[in-house]
Amino acid sequence: MNWTKLLFAISAVICLPLYGFLSITRFDAQTGFLTAGTLTTVFYAALAVLAVLMLAGSFLQKKQLRFSIFNSRLLAVLAMVLGGVLVLCGVFDLLNIGYAILDSLDFLPAALLSGVLLSGAQAVMAVVSGIVFVRLGVSFLLERIANRSSITFIFPVIWALLACVEMFRDYPQIAGMPERTLYLLCLLCFTLFLMGHSRILGDVDFAKGTCWINAFGFCGALFGLTMTVGEVLCFSSMTLPLSDVLLVFALSLYCLAFSFNTYADR
């Protein structure tokens, strides 16, 4: 039995409805924080403990874990959806950056310029990463994924890391903002998931790749789906842009679907 898969199911049953309830009853729209209380503490503790157990279970079972793709059609759809959302988000961000530059063309402070460059690089990487996932989706559809070049997956890794840096820049108090903390954790897990993802598709150190996608794929899906549930239930006071919510949802589903191909030998 794959312990991580079992722990993910338990985590989803506990954390998703609990965070949804807290988002409705304990969320302060003005501060972006959850009000302190027993349930809030229980949620954070459960999320942290279960995530650690998922990681530990995967690494303890490393030698027993195996990987075999049995849902290539589903992965094809999810990869193309994720790629499409990434491209749309990147293009939208580039247009906004272009308009911002045109509006302040006469006077662009150095501090603002560095932010524009970071946002621009992140948007470009989003577009390139989207193209990578669309191509991967086509490969899944045609069932031609053996020995796929893993070098192209450096672009999604760069995009995710730039998105994390941009989030820290815009929200220094991110640790107290549950939806952005979950977003950040999802991106970090996605980055590490891609390390295993590229090893599997490139057929390089397959065992290590299987362990990494099993560990970080399920954790990333847990963080992303938990965040999505909270944002959907608090749609009227949603603090994240709708595009980000859709992106995290698509990203989480892809991580989950890919990681579900792992199993443990008896």
Task: Set out the residue ranges of the language-model regions.
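Alpha-helical transmembrane segments of polytopic membrane proteins
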Residues: T35-A51, A76-L82, C89-D93, A110-G130, ...
